[in-house]
Amino acid sequence: MYKLVLVITAAAARAECVVKKQTHAFYYLWYGTPTTDGKWLHWDHAVLPHWTKKVRAQYKHLENYTHEPPTRLHAPFYPAAGPYSSSDPQLLDAHFSQLRDAGVDAAVLSWTGRPGGAVSDTQGVGTDAIVPLAIAAAKRAGIGAAIHLEPYEGRGAESVALDLAHLVTHDLYRLPRRPCGGHDRLPVVYLYDAYHTPAKEWARLFCENGDLSVRGTPHDVVVIATLLNRDEEDLVVNGCFDG
């Protein structure tokens, strides 16, 4: 099983099983500019309510404030390249070359839902069409591309089963489900905010005996849950996540 903070590491348990440390960087594909995309995307993101009552009360006056690019951006730092479009191939080449030079093995691409559906992020932005561009840029830079499956309304075992059937058609970065033992290498998918869904629901999809199990099928993946708190680790085990 893989453990995740923001960097994947796997330690060799036996002398004959030496596992290379992996570094994965999350890369968001939802940015846009009027020149390339017809309007600002995500740079003008509205301020959302904080998830804890105490912090929300402190900053309630800022809720729904909308940033005003190009001078005021929804970003902790102003990009060196200025506000950019994620669908700009030259920009993607530059960013993935920087990731390669920093020693990153794979970029984890934010994905907001299947094409043709009503699924998008909270700002109404879909990223599916940009994924092939980003994968191609990652290949040119010599790094891999994994998927970061964003939450959406109604996300559960049945919808994610359809998501995986779509996502595995891409040439994604692969790892074995277990670091040692000669397991097949499978596409790597991160499930963001997995804790919003009960473990028993994920077990339907990721446990071998689940009624929707992808294990051993063409849609099988190395699936890693992203969590907020250590007390959510039971979700990883009971939901049959790989890390």
Regions found by a protein language model. Name each.
Residues 2-15:
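Cleavable N-terminal signal peptides of Sec/SRP-targeted secreted and luminal proteins
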Residues 16-243:
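Glycan-processing catalytic domains of CAZymes
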